[in-house]
Amino acid sequence: MGHFCYFQQIHFHSFAYSRLIGEIAISTPSRRNTLSPSRANDYMNCPLLYRFRVIDKLPEPPSADALKGTLVHAILEDLFGLDRLERTPDRAHDLLQPTWEQLKEKTSGVTEMFQNVDLEQWLISAHSLLDRYFELEDPKSFDPTDLEKFVEYQMEDGPMIHGYIDRLDIAPTGEIRIVDYKTGKSPKAAYEEKSLFQMRFYALILWRTLGKIPKRLQLLYLGDKNRLISEPTEAELVKTEGKILSIWSDIQLSYETGLWKPKKSKLCDWCAHQSICPEFGGTPPPLPVQVSD
């Protein structure tokens, strides 16, 4: 793990957060005036999906894969709450069942979710993800500075950008590392830049709020035991800032015109809104009268 260890606590504006429930409470002036990496990606992938999630706030059934990600994230967060010597594979596996029981109680639709999914195999695969985590790094060798950290920054002539960082490590030398866990497989080389957008989004916030560019961005892919590592430059973060402002400008135009165009792609296979999507012969519901706040 090198020299990254517990060094200091960065003080950002914090909010109540719960991975188990999957709910985020964000106290901001208006959802129209804020942007997270997830919502930015929604708009880039399909403006209509952004509308369904942000304006219409349509419910989406939970998926077994997403729930597994929530479970593993919660276990890793709890693991770092233990003393270093207790952060072992056996201890992580011991945490799985009680964490799953809590998650099951907090999540609606679990029974329906596992009608077509083998629960036993699903839990086995979650154990496998934990094993792969320990093959990627040794959590006994360092203490994180922050876990599930909410960060935000008000862009000039733009939105309040915000997000949750899975883990923030600060070295004794002051170098910052942003770490994000992914329970899926690592992207092919052609798609790495798209995956790094989220991490540069976070790095931009830290740079603008702290005046220091993070040294390393690290994505840990537990699905195939791979790392994606990047050392961001000022030029890359300035480019990311411009990209965010461009996305934001397009979103504002959609608000003004009421046009939220669907964009057909392979991602449509996982979309919960095909029945009301024009690309699949559906009709979206009327836009709410008030969409600005």
List the model feature ranges, each with a label.
Residues 5-66, 293:
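C-terminal, charged and often intrinsically disordered regions of DNA end-processing helicases
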Residues 71-82, 250, 254:
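Solvent-exposed, amphipathic alpha-helical segments
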